[in-house]
Structures are given as C-alpha cells and as structure tokens.
C-alpha cells in the first residue's frame, strides 16, 4: 500500500468486503499536512500565515489539498499558482515594471490566501461512494457567493474524481493524485497537484 507515499491512484490495498481502499489516516487534515512537508510545506506555510489552522481540524468536510507542485511548478502546462499570479515591482535602475513569480503564499495579502484556502474545503463528505456521475456544484467554506466547487465521479476503467471541469476554468479535467483518504476527524482528503479557481457568476448562471 502506498497511501502515505501518495504515489499512485491505483496503489491502494483494497478491502473487497467494503469495496473501498484501506484509506484511514489517524490524524487531522492539518496534522497530515504537517507530517508531509516534502509535498505540503507551502500549504502548511499558507495555513499558518492565514491563521486558519482550526479550519483544517473539522469533521464532516472534504479537504482538497494542493501540493507544492500546485503552487510552484515552473512547467508551463502545470499553470501553477505562483506562475499564474505573478507580482510586480519597479526596477530602480530602469524604472520598468518587472513581473516575478513569488516563492511563498506569504507574498500575497493575507485575506487572499485565507479565501484561497477556504475555497479548497468543501462542506460535507464526498468520495467515490457518494459523488454523482454528472458535474455538480458544492458549497465550500469560503465566503464569496461564487465560492463553489464542481465535482463528479468519472466512471471509467480507472474511476476518479474530476474537479472544476467547466468552460473557462484555467485547466480542465483536474484529478487528484491520491484520493479518498479518511482522517481522524471524520473528513475526506484528496491530494492534488493543481489548485482550483472560483467560477464567475456567469459560469454559475447567477444574476
């Protein structure tokens, strides 16, 4: 079993009686993040910076956990958060405006980081057994009226969850690298190498 290694979606030890992977993690979402600094160091730093540790210790939630790759990958097709949210400064010698990709979420306003993190927490427990086969909007903990996540279960040879696969999202068909981890607080966790962006009111058909 490679659950804690988080290597592959299909590497679980299956419990054929239950019909589900052996997926229990004996710690909270925040403890799990802290235990895996090799892939979650930027996420942990962001959580501490925004002061939302307690939000990652809740029961009955679905946590979508972006890895360091989601934040800092320099591969153009990854469209990482830092690459798509570059900051600027004025070069003192030339007076020109220079863009750069930061190396930490602490470079952004604290409220922006807080809303980003809360958007990746879905209200309710969602996993392979209860997600619909059609794209469906779900409420998140974030406060904006457009802070909804689109999820569904893609039922093919290798079933997987698909996130925010709607027209206009910066990347299509985002899937977790590891899914259905069930933590000690009674919440599900899905580990992702991509971040998720909020839809617009138009995309939600809101007036």
Question: What do these predicted regions represent?
Answer:
Residues 1-207:
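Mature, structured domains of secreted/extracytosolic soluble proteins
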């Amino acid at each position: 079993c490679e659950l804690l290694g988080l290597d592959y979606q299909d590497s679980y030890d299956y419990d054929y009686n239950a019909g589900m992977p052996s997926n229990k993690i004996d710690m909270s979402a925040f403890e799990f993040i802290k235990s895996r600094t090799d892939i979650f160091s930027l996420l942990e730093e962001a959580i501490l910076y925004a002061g939302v540790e307690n939000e990652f210790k809740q029961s009955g939630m679905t946590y979508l956990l972006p890895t360091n790759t989601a934040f800092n990958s320099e591969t153009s097709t990854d469209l990482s958060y830092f690459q798509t949210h570059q900051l600027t400064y004025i070069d003192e010698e030339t007076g020109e405006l220079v863009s750069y990709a930061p190396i930490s979420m602490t470079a952004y306003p604290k409220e922006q980081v807080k809303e980003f993190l809360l958007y990746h927490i879905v209200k309710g427990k969602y996993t392979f057994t209860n997600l619909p086969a059609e794209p469906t909007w779900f409420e998140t903990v974030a406060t904006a009226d457009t802070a909804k996540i689109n999820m569904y279960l893609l039922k093919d040879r290798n079933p997987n969850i698909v996130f925010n696969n709607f027209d206009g999202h910066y990347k299509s068909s985002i899937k977790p690298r590891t899914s259905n981890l069930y933590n000690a607080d009674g919440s599900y966790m899905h580990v992702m190498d991509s971040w998720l962006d909020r839809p617009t009111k138009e995309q939600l058909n809101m007036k």
